[in-house]
Amino acid sequence: MDNYEKQVYTGRELFLKYDQDKLIKKYGLKHDEEYLYLKYIGTEYRINRRNGAVEYATGEEWTDCREYTVVMTIYDFLCCSEQEILPPFTGQWQPVGRFVTAGSSPSTDPFVEKYARAFSGKVEEVKQACICLGGKQTKRLAGADLTFEMPVLPEFSVLLQFWDGDEEFPPKILLLWDKVSLSYLHFETTYYLQGDLLKAILQIIG
């Protein structure tokens, strides 16, 4: 078992310590006797209430989820906050680097730049992919070619901005987070979620 698998099993054990009825009420989760259900970046997931295993829907079937970032983001979303009542979202967006004194915005991360290059020249394709994932196009901010509010978890959205490249400037992606986001996720998890979202968009546009 590698370190990633060990951390996934640690996440399962942590999840199983929580009062699931409280989680259902807190996050408005669909549920039955065996599973809790939630949508993450346009895909339906379920969590086994007995052993904590995460599965995703593929047509009529359910498949064991082995994507570390997906599994850990779902666990963190459900287990991060100790508050019984979560703070309401403010609609005030900021780069993730604003949440810490020492830290940089993912917009400067080579990982994000890789996706920006992949999206270059494909504004319409990126737009349609965002719509496919449930995104809502909003007014353009800071001259971005696309600005979308993307629902990524139950009642939780991020703001995605994309500037296409030209002769003077390279393409750029920026994800903005509601100022109360860290009441819902740990700082490190925002990077997992960011990667999962950009990967999902790229898979759709091909």
Can you say where each PLM-predicted feature lies in the sequence?
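Intrinsically disordered, low-complexity regulatory segments enriched in Ser/Thr/Pro
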Residues: 44-69, 163-188
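Short Lys/Arg-enriched alpha/beta "domain-start" segment
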Residues: 1-34, 40, 70, 77-134
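Short amphipathic C-terminal alpha-helix that caps PH/PH-like domains
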Residues: 74, 78, 194-197
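Domain-length accessory/inserted modules outside core catalytic folds
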Residues: 45, 100, 111-116, 142-144, ...
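A recognition module on extended beta-rich or small alphabeta surfaces enriched in W/G with H and D/E
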Residues: 178-206
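Conserved aromatic-histidine-acidic binding/catalytic patches
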Residues: 62, 103, 114-117, 148, ...
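Conserved binding-pocket/active-site segment within a compact domain
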Residues: 121-183
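Amphipathic, interaction-prone secondary-structure segments
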Residues: 24-50, 139-164
